[in-house]
């Protein structure tokens, strides 16, 4: 169980991805390999990636970081640079990302 008091300085990031039609399986495969690596990054409280049941080319990310520094460090990891920046992003038709803080 998460101690929610630890999240007072936390950062929640949600993202919505839509893969190009011919790239859905490739994106899903990349994300399956990426998620366990991201879950083990320092400062990650939660990191889940979901694929739509109704529209398989759509993906939803729910990420909780202990602070902004942890989020920035996550984006600098070798697995983020290789798998997300280097492989997945070019296979997307759409990408949206939103950041939230605990109130």
Where are the regions that the model predicts?
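Non-catalytic surface loops within mature trypsin-like serine protease
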Residues: 19-21, 67, 101-103
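Residues at secondary-structure transition points
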Residues: 2, 6, 25, 74-78
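Glycine-rich beta-strand-turn "strand-cap" elements at beta-sheet edges
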Residues: 1-9, 49-57, 84-103
